A protein has these predicted regions:
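A domain-start/cap signature at the N-terminus of enzymes
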Residues: 4-196
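Active-site machinery of serine-nucleophile hydrolases
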Residues: 198, 202-226
Length: 226
């Protein structure tokens, strides 16, 4: 058991060092790059990577870290690998910054489209027209962008009394019928950029949604945690 614990701790230490190295390399390559066009967009996506890079997303930097010391690649190409890996996932690295950078704009437009109220058809049509003009808006890119982006909507802002150990009660409008309410139990370390296995549990006539959550996740302890 001690050997297994040591192995896990060593893995965490290695991941931490890789994350720190990725951040340092991003700063270094940003200083070396000579790109002036869309510089603000380049800075925005690099800032996002540095802010949200963690153990759950470090695998997206695999191509970038592997080729970061390749003297044959320019700083622009290395940043393209970092950006495309961040947006599309590990193994999807693109060395052309002119192809990788528009993916950031495409991703942001997709997020805006999903956030826009369904009754605002005009704005949604405008977003679709913008997407049609951008490189990287094809189905093969959109599928990967959506799979690796954060949820379009923020979780509901609840008081500490209403939010017990990651438990949320949400509802879905059902037209003329009353809203459909349901419960979601998130794990303590929940990260929206990590993929988790999901259990969809339907209660029967003799139980309640809360009882189903208790059965799968356990009951609360004194610290209001499961």
């Amino acid at each position: 058991l001690q050997l297994r614990v040591k192995e896990i701790l060593d893995q965490y230490a290695e991941l931490r060092m890789s994350g720190e190295r990725a951040t340092q390399l991003l700063d270094q390559h940003m200083q070396q790059v000579t790109v002036k066009e869309n510089r603000d967009q380049l800075e925005a996506v690099v800032d996002e990577i540095k802010l949200r890079l963690n153990w759950n997303t470090l695998d997206r930097m695999a191509d970038y870290l592997r080729l970061s010391d390749d003297a044959a690649l320019k700083p622009e190409q290395k940043l393209a690998l970092a950006i495309s890996g961040w947006l599309l996932g590990g193994g999807a690295g693109i060395e052309n910054l002119g192809t990788a950078l528009p993916l950031f704009q495409v991703r942001n437009l997709v997020l805006e489209y999903l956030k826009t109220d369904t009754v605002d058809l005009q704005r949604r049509r405008e977003i679709l027209e913008q997407l049609a003009q951008l490189e990287g808006s094809g189905p093969e890119f959109l599928a990967k962008l959506i799979a690796h982006m954060a949820p379009p909507l923020d979780p509901p802002q609840l008081s500490e009394e209403d939010t017990i150990g990651g438990l949320f009660q949400l509802s879905v409008p059902m037209g003329d019928a009353p809203p459909l309410k349901y419960l979601i139990q998130l794990p303590p370390e929940y990260d929206p950029l990590r993929r988790y296995p999901t259990v969809l549990s339907l209660h029967d006539a003799n139980t309640t949604p809360a009882m189903q959550i208790d059965w799968w996740a356990g009951i609360y302890n004194q610290d209001r945690k499961r």
